A protein has these predicted regions:
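The conserved cystathionine-beta-synthase
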Residues: 13-31, 38, 81-98, 104-106, ...
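Tandem CBS (Bateman) regulatory domains
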Residues: 1-10, 50-80, 85-95, 111-146
Length: 146
């Protein structure tokens, strides 16, 4: 099965210069936990911001989320796949990079959606492979220096 058959196609983004407070509010209203990050200079996706990025890289360090911007704490580089890739390729990328979401690109390398662990769970992926991906991305990474 192709990625385009299981991905979430409604894609919303946020600019690197958007405050973390505004980004968190946007996530709350949309009931989502991540957004692609777009550069205001060239309108290209340059990273992802997650609710976890905001908490771990800003709130936990005592930063002011009203003045700190998305570009300061976003995850980069991006982990991507193409909409015509097999679903297994997306799961392999998630496992290798230890991410829960992968940006989906079209044949012109333009973002067209996201594929998440939840999308994989609803697709035809082998249960053993799904378990392997979940275990891998859920294993704690080495702690960052304070």
């Amino acid at each position: 099965m192709k990625v385009k058959e299981v991905m979430s196609a409604e894609l919303r983004g946020v600019r690197t210069d958007t405050s973390l407070k505004d980004t968190a509010e946007h996530m709350r209203l949309l009931d989502i936990g991540s957004l692609p990050v777009v550069s205001p200079e060239n309108n290209r996706v340059v990273g992802m911001i997650t609710d976890r990025d905001i908490v771990v890289r800003s709130v936990a360090r005592g930063a002011d989320v009203s003045t700190q911007n998305v570009g300061d704490v976003m995850s980069s580089p991006l982990v991507c796949c193409h909409e015509d890739d097999e679903v297994e390729e997306a799961s392999t990328a998630m496992k290798a990079k230890r991410v829960r979401r992968v940006l989906v690109l079209n044949d012109k390398n333009q973002p067209v959606g996201l594929v998440s662990l939840g999308d994989l769970a609803q697709g035809p992926i082998d249960q053993a492979e799904l378990t392997s991906v979940v275990r891998n991305v859920s294993t704690p990474a080495p702690a960052e220096a304070p």
